[in-house]
Design a protein with these regions (language model features):
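Domain-level detector for secreted/extracellular nuclease and nuclease-toxin modules, and
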Residues: 1-323
Length: 323
């Protein structure tokens, strides 16, 4: 059970800290229990994102205010996209950006720490997200048909309590995934999830899991075209991702005992991994699948770790991640 009273921001980040965030966390506009609103990006003057050609400089963060939700991305507003944050009491679970066009998530951002893990058993109770309009969601009582129901934030990563786990079964956290060679039994995505799980440390790991729906050329040169599927549960057309990615930010040592804001850029590391949505049993994370965060930003148009100006987003060294 989560020891809420004794957790720091870096151990089990608190939802209440949203209200103490700097203006750069402003994309989250709704509170828990209210209807989600379309994503709106606000560019704060103190932490504007540099152009891709401008290098980030190493700087200490001792004078920076606490960063409430370091994992949050920012992106251009679009009326078809909705974001909402789910929490359990004072402890936040995850934030999702959901596309009402694809009827599937664009990204899910979450803090990762062993304190979120326990022995709660999954119930597979796939249900509508109570904070979004039902008419923009798709029903998932069973699999899509051709594709399995793939978690963006895994059920196994949130089993410290019943409520934490149940929230991972909201349909806004689910996207179509190939079963064989991808989602299960040593598939490419299954192996990447295992790799990311090994990066969880004493300090908090900040993670964004995302999906791409435009045509994508995988690292082996295979072009994966844009596609859709008909969800057999409600006959709704659902976008099928052409690629999935994970973006990570954490301290290098993993055991500083300090918040991200208190660390220098030299004490941090971040990287992105992307895999084409195709059957590739045995495929494991490699340097070929690795990008710098800045490179993924150029590919997706999303500003990752937007509230962490000293994150080393232009760096991506495979050796830093044991590759």
């Amino acid at each position: 059970m989560l020891a809420i009273s004794y957790m720091r921001d870096e151990i089990a980040p608190r939802l209440q800290e949203i209200f103490h965030a700097e203006q750069s966390a402003a994309p989250i506009t709704q509170k828990e229990g209210t209807e989600a609103t379309p994503l709106v990006k606000e560019k704060p003057a103190p932490q504007q994102v540099e152009s891709p050609s401008t290098p980030r400089t190493a700087k200490t963060a001792t004078s920076i205010k606490p960063i409430a939700m370091p994992e949050l991305p920012q992106m251009q507003s679009a009326k078809e996209n909705y974001i909402t944050t789910h929490s359990c009491g004072e402890v936040r679970n995850y934030t999702v950006c959901y596309s009402s066009i694809h009827h599937s998530p664009l990204w899910v951002a979450a803090p990762m720490h062993r304190s979120y893990e326990g022995d709660t058993k999954r119930k597979d109770n796939y249900t509508f997200d109570p904070t979004l309009p039902v008419n923009v969601q798709t029903r998932l009582n069973s699999s899509y048909g051709e594709y399995t129901r793939g978690h963006m934030l895994g059920s196994a990563e949130r089993n410290a309590s019943r409520e934490l786990n149940d929230q991972t079964f909201y349909v806004t956290n689910i996207a179509p995934q190939l079963r064989e060679g991808f989602n299960q039994m040593g598939g490419a995505w299954n192996n990447l999830e295992s790799f990311v799980d090994k990066q969880v440390c004493a300090d908090t790991l900040y993670l964004v899991t995302g999906a791409i729906y435009e045509p994508y050329t995988d690292s082996n040169g295979e072009l994966i075209p844009a596609r859709t599927t008909i969800n057999k549960n409600d006959e709704q057309e659902v976008g099928v991702p052409t690629a999935y990615y994970k973006v990570m930010l954490r301290t290098r040592s993993g055991k500083t005992g300090r918040s991200i804001a208190e660390c220098t850029s030299e004490e941090l590391k971040c990287a992105a991994f992307i895999v084409g949505h195709r059957s590739a049993k045995g495929r494991k994370p490699s340097a070929e699948d690795m990008l710098s965060v800045r490179e993924l930003e150029l590919l997706t148009g999303i500003d990752f770790f937007a509230t962490v100006p000293h994150a080393p987003e232009t760096e991506a060294d495979p050796k830093d991640w044991g590759l």
